[in-house]
Amino acid sequence: MSSEKEVQEKIATLQILQEEAEALQRRLMELEILENEYRKTLETLEFFESIDTSVEALMNLGGGVFAYVDVKNSKKMLVDIGSGVVVEREVGEAIEFVKNRIKKIEENQEKMTSMLQQVLSQAQRIQQELAARQQKE
C-alpha cells in the first residue's frame, strides 16, 4: 500500500471517529437531560408520598400558561410504562419505577462514556501516527 493512500485512509478513519465521538457526546447530553427530568419527578413523588392531605399545585398547560389545581388523591399516580401504556400505581411504586429508570440511565451513561473514551483513544492514536509520519517527511 502506498504511503499516500495509507495517510488518506487514516484521515478518513479519523474523521469517522470524530463524528462518532460527537454523536456519543450528544447522546450523553440527552441522557443527562433525561436523568435530570427523572430526578425532578422523583423529588415531586417523594413530596406527594410525605403528605396526607390534598395539595394545591400549578399545572403547566403549555405556552407559558399555568393553572391552579387541587390534587385530591396524591397517593395514586398514572405511570407511562412504555409504548404509550399508562397504568395506575401507588406513589411508592411510582417512586421505585422512576428510581429504576434513573439506574438504567446511569448504566447507559457509563457505557456511553466508556465507548467515547475508546473512540477518543483510537482517534488520538491515529493523530499521533499521522504526526509521526509527517515529522519523518
Curated annotation (Swiss-Prot):
Sorted alphabetically, the keyword list is: Chaperone, Cytoplasm
Say which family it is in.
Belongs to the prefoldin subunit alpha family.
Subcellular location per the Swiss-Prot or TrEMBL entry: Cytoplasm
Q: How does it assemble?
A: Heterohexamer of two alpha and four beta subunits.
The protein's matches in HAMAP family, at most eight in alphabetical order, are given as: PfdA (MF_00308)
Broad class of where this protein is predominantly found: cytoplasm
| Known role | Molecular chaperone capable of stabilizing a range of proteins. Seems to fulfill an ATP-independent, HSP70-like function in archaeal de novo protein folding.
Listed transmembrane segments: none
| Name of the protein in its database record | Prefoldin subunit alpha
Q: GO CC: one term?
A: cytoplasm
